[in-house]
Every structure is written in structure tokens, then in C-alpha cells.
């Protein structure tokens, strides 16, 4: 195994976590890495920290750019990446030591286009030897088989950082310029291009669950990008009867989540009718008896209440 892996790290306001993140990549047991740190106009000490790391390790390259968001930061790095394989790490997370060795080994042994693993999620840092020791399994399957889960928005299939992509498969593929959920459409199109994938149950990545991160902070205008991300998939599958029902489900899930966030935070309520309209466009698909996807009775009840009595829906959501 001597393939070059390009590891892309967007960096913005992660000063507290950046050293741990980069150190974990530098310390990988697989050494043939191109580490691209993209300083997305971070206003703290991150730019200087990135430069300091580049001086310590010749495998590290730093891109300094104006702040345009994580999607553009990743796209900028993708356009310059030289690796045979591509990986992504978020600046506030870190990798366990064998991550890229094992992802690449699985990719080569199974002869697949995308290799993915499980991950450990917490707000408390752990070391690899503290993880539960379970027998490692690697399952090879057609990428087409997991497209329903991608369309629905299954988290493990939607994120970037637990995967290794063959560069030739994702060549020219970019993320839409969204503030959140931009990785879901990227993965959707990557899986559409891929032939075979490998899925390991081994926890190789530490995902830091912190309340101030982009994905977990309080409801804000960028949260509506979750709907835009699903809309991209919905439009792509509108003429595909096999996947369109799953794309609808993912779109409805996103709209209901955004609507609940709006109501709970009492923010952007001027857009309530807009999001409600998004949902009601697909009430027939959810409420009819014979559907490709069987929705839970609880979800059907939410749809009916939102349709017939939006004021009651708001009161129930606020309880």
C-alpha cells in the first residue's frame, strides 16, 4: 500500500481543537498523506497554527482564503488535491491512529470505490484503546444498495469524515455552497458514481459533539440549507420511481426538523407558511395507504395536524 491519500481539513474558529486534530492526522500509522489545511479566513489564531504545522511536517500544505464557508473551503482543496484517494476531517474532530491504514486496506482488499467506517461520538475525548473491543467486520456491497439510505439522509452515509473516496470516482464533483448539509448531496452523487463500497464497523474517527459547532448550534438561517440539500436529491430522482419515494421522505424529514426548530426557538416564524407548503406538497405520498415507504402513524398524525390546524401544530410542538 503506497497510494497517496489527500486529507482535507477545513479550518474556521477551531483554535481550541486544531492541534489535536492535525496531530492525529500526522500520527497516522499510514504515512503517505497529503494533508491540506484550508484556513477559511478564520479570525483567531488558526491561520498561524496552520502555518506552524506546515513548518513541522512537509506533508502539510496550507491554503489561506477569504471566508466563504466550509463547502467552498473543501472544494478549493479538492481542486488542488493530488491523492489517489480523498479523505475529509473536520477541524474540531480527530482520527484514531489506524484510520487511513484500515480504510485504505479495506478499499484495496475489497476492490471498492468508497471505504467507510463507524465512528465514536462524544463531547469527552477518548483514546483508541478505550473503545469497546468488538470483532471487526467489513461488508462489501453495491453502492446502489445504500442509495435509499443516502436519499433519506441516514447520518452515517451523509457525512464525509468516516469515508475514503477513490479520487477518480469523485473527480470534478463539488459540494453545493450551503452552510450546512452540503456533504449530503456530495455523498449522494459520489455513491451514484461508485460501483462497490466497503462498510466497516470499526470506530476509526472521533466526532466531537459540541453545542457551539456549525451543526449543533442554535437554530439560525443556515439551518434552511438542510432543506436545500434534500431538494437537490429530490430533483435528481424525480424521474426515478425506485428512489423518488426515499428522496421525498428525506425532504419531508428535513422540513419537519426545520419547522420544529423554528417553533422551538421562535425564530424565522415568518417562513412558517413556506416550510409548511413544502411539506403539504407531499401529503398524498405520506397519507395514502399503499406507498413504497410505510410512514409511522405518528408522522402521519403530524402531517394531518399541520394540514388541518397549523395553530394546533405549533402549540403541540412547543409543549
Each model region followed by its residue ranges:
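Donor-binding/catalytic cores of nucleotide-activated saccharide
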Residues: 91-197, 208-221
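Acidic helix N-cap motif at the loop->helix transition within catalytic regions
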Residues: 19, 33, 44-52, 94, ...
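Membrane-interface aromatic/basic loop that binds lipid-linked glycans or pyrophosphate carriers
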Residues: 264-319
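Short aromatic/hydrophobic "clamp" motif used to bind/position activated sugar donors
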Residues: 86
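N-proximal low-complexity "stem/linker" segments adjacent to membrane-targeting elements
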Residues: 1-26
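Catalytic core of nucleotide-sugar-dependent glycosyltransferases
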Residues: 204-210, 216-242, 257-286
Amino acid at each position: 500500500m503506497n497510494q497517496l491519500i489527500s486529507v482535507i481539513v477545513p479550518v474556521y474558529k477551531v483554535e481550541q481543537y486544531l492541534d489535536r486534530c492535525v496531530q492525529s492526522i500526522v500520527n497516522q500509522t499510514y504515512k503517505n498523506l497529503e494533508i491540506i489545511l484550508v484556513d477559511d479566513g478564520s479570525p483567531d489564531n488558526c491561520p498561524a497554527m496552520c502555518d506552524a504545522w506546515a513548518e513541522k511536517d512537509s506533508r502539510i500544505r496550507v491554503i489561506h482564503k477569504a471566508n466563504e464557508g466550509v463547502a467552498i473551503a473543501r472544494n478549493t482543496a479538492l481542486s488542488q488535491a493530488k491523492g489517489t484517494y480523498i479523505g475529509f476531517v473536520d477541524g474540531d474532530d480527530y482520527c484514531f491512529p489506524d484510520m487511513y491504514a484500515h480504510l485504505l486496506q479495506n478499499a484495496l482488499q475489497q476492490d471498492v470505490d468508497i471505504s467507510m467506517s463507524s465512528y465514536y461520538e462524544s463531547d469527552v475525548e477518548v483514546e483508541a484503546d478505550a473503545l469497546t473491543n468488538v470483532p471487526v467486520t467489513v461488508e462489501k456491497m453495491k453502492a446502489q444498495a445504500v442509495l435509499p439510505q443516502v436519499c433519506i439522509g441516514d447520518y452515517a452515509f451523509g457525512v464525509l469524515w468516516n469515508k475514503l473516496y477513490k479520487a477518480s470516482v469523485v473527480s470534478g464533483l463539488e459540494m453545493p455552497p450551503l452552510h450546512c448539509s452540503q456533504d449530503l448531496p456530495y455523498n449522494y452523487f459520489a455513491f451514484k458514481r461508485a460501483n462497490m463500497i466497503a462498510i466497516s464497523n470499526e470506530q476509526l474517527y472521533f466526532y466531537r459533539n459540541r453545542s457551539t459547532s456549525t451543526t449543533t448550534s442554535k437554530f439560525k438561517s443556515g439551518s434552511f440549507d438542510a432543506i436545500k440539500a434534500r431538494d437537490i436529491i429530490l430533483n435528481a430522482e424525480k424521474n426515478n420511481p425506485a428512489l423518488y419515494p426515499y428522496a421525498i421522505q428525506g425532504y419531508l424529514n428535513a422540513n419537519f426538523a426545520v419547522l420544529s426548530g423554528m417553533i422551538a426557538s421562535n425564530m424565522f416564524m415568518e417562513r412558517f407558511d413556506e416550510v409548511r407548503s413544502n411539506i403539504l406538497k407531499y401529503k398524498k405520498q405520506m397519507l395514502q395507504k399503499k406507498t413504497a415507504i410505510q410512514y409511522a402513524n405518528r408522522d402521519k398524525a403530524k402531517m394531518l395536524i399541520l394540514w388541518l390546524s397549523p395553530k394546533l401544530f405549533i402549540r403541540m410542538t412547543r409543549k
